[in-house]
Amino acid sequence: MASAVQTVCGQAYGAKKYAAMGIICQRAIVLHLGAAVLLTFLYCYSDAVLQAIGQSKSIAEQAQVFARGLIPQLYAFALSCPMQRFLQAQNIVNPLAFMSVGVFLLHILFTWLIIDIMGYGLLGASLTLSLSWWLLVILNGLYIVLSPSCKETWTGLSFKAFKGIWPYFKLTAASAVMLWYIYFSFSI
């Protein structure tokens, strides 16, 4: 779904319709948050789903513990992907790389502390992933709001993001199907 952000934002950037880029990013965030809500139910009941497709009970139970710890990550991912595509469409990639490396290094430290030192195990591992993604969202958001590089493209939150959401949804759905088809065809 996020690949549509890069396409549409890239077109807006090329057409010098800079203010439209922020609206496109917000529209994508709204759709991604909707998808995250739907996926939350799958994560909550992953034990039953996994057992229904033949996974053993013990593995399904452990997978559910891990999946439930990843629920906050779903929402962070819903925010992060459109923001990253928004920045990439403007050729702002070095700050993204620096933020990602910084969060990765903190993630290593957090994982060691939470799993090895504090002993939180599987749930700790998934919650650490969620924490790291939220740190990345915060850094990306601060960069977008505070950086002079985004002054023309980010004009603040707007209700315009809800206008034209259905055509944008159709574009993102088509993009997701296309990417799934490409992935599936190469895995055969």
Model-derived regions: residue spans:
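Helix-terminus/linker motif at the lipid-water interface of multi-pass membrane proteins
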Residues: 50-57, 113-120, 176, 180-188
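Membrane-interface helix-loop junctions in multi-pass transport and translocation proteins
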Residues: 60-61, 94-138, 142-146
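Hydrophobic alpha-helical transmembrane bundles that constitute the permease/transmembrane domains
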Residues: 1-4, 40-41, 74-82, 86-90, ...
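Alpha-helical transmembrane segments of multi-pass membrane proteins
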Residues: 22-35, 41-45, 57-83, 98, 105, 170-174, 178, ...
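Interhelical loop/hinge segments that connect adjacent transmembrane helices in multipass membrane
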Residues: 122, 126-132, 138-186
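Small-residue-rich hydrophobic transmembrane alpha-helices
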Residues: 1-40, 80-89, 96
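Membrane-embedded alpha-helical segments of multi-pass transporters/permeases
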Residues: 37-44, 52, 69, 108, ...
